[in-house]
Amino acid sequence: MRISGIDAAKALQALAGRLPTPRRASLARLTDTDGGALDHALILWFPGPATATGEDLAELHLHGGRAVVAAVEAALAAMPGLRRAEAGEFTRRAFANGRIDLAEAEGLADLLAAETESQRVQALDHASGHVSRAVAGWQARLLALMAAAEAELNFADEDDVEVGEGVAQRVSEGMAALAGELGEWLARPAAEVIAEGLSVVIAGPPNAGKSTLINALAQRELAIVSPVAGTTRDVIETPLALDGIAMRFSDTAGLRGESADAIEMIGIDRAKAAVEGADILLWLGAPKEAPEHPRTILIAAQADRWRGDAAAEAEAAHCDLILSAATGEGMDRLHTMIVEMARTLLPREGEATLRQRQRDALAEAKGWLEVETGSREAGDLILLAERLRLAGATLDRITGRGGVEDMLDTLFGRFCIGK
């Protein structure tokens, strides 16, 4: 149990009768205001500001029984000045007190929600300050360019200020170089790709084995398998993780030209939309009928049914994979192919990614830094200095130094009470 704020010391003394040596675990008998025993617990005392929240902070390591926790909570609630923490309030106080910045707080939120290895790695990278350090480096370069521009504008006639010739050109070239680096970051996959999972769509004509395949991948019955064409009428989606990569697999209605069933036609339209939005397409059908898609795996499915059929064997030769979800043939190879294709959509090892909010700010900053070479503006230091200022203010939004109040409640509301 964690207590943070100006009354943390009073609360700990009231429960334990003393303040232990800072930052050392100590065994204590906890009592309520009437002297009644609550628990024997480990207590820790962290005087601010060098704490997680930047405030005085106390921790109680209790026995985990519900009655114990409830009794200690009741004792704390009876003390003046104390109240239950709101969701994410400890992290919000850390942000307000400068212990972490907004990008690190967002990384911590993602770390708490991480379910796959790739999500954990990305979130820990953000929470550890990778993005924040990059922003600090960009800001330092902006300040250097701004200093050069301001020196030329305000102090060019001073003997002790070295400005030299061609300052506007050097500043505009520095802006172009920085804009190029921001563009490289924007070209990376968005963080949401890892957080939300890649979309893998299973598509093909009716009775191609799509539902059998998604059931085999999920290792449970998600979709009805029937010899009757048109059984699947809607998109059936399930989250799966392959080799630590989050994915969303979708089974779709069989694609065919026309159907007398209006409901099936709605399902076909939804299937087509799913194919268009897929990151990876698994096509179970004739290769020549596969939709155009940059990342398609052509699958000759239901191999257990057509083995020995010369025509089917000839068509399968044009596919990437021969598979039977019923017998398991080709399933391991399909797993490998999906993972290999998925990795091409993910950031390289050690490469940080950006959330959409951060990408929007970075794109705006890049826009302020882009000035056409040889234009009048490229030679105007006053305009260049203003562009540099606006770019810096925009980058501040990534780490939470400006213009972010409207989204703080939403962010910290995602945290659990203990954070």
From Swiss-Prot:
One GO CC term, this protein: cytoplasm
Swiss-Prot/TrEMBL keywords: Cytoplasm, GTP-binding, Hydrolase, Magnesium, Metal-binding, Nucleotide-binding, Potassium, tRNA processing
GO molecular function: GTP binding; GTPase activity; metal ion binding
Residues holding GTP: 207-212, 226-232, 251-254
Ligand binding (Mg(2+)): S211, T232
Enzyme Commission numbers on file: 3.6.-.-
Positions of (6S)-5-formyl-5,6,7,8-tetrahydrofolate binding: R2, E59, R99, K419
Family: Belongs to the TRAFAC class TrmE-Era-EngA-EngB-Septin-like GTPase superfamily. TrmE GTPase family.
The protein's name in its UniProt record: tRNA modification GTPase MnmE
Native source species: Sphingopyxis alaskensis (strain DSM 13593 / LMG 18877 / RB2256) (Sphingomonas alaskensis)
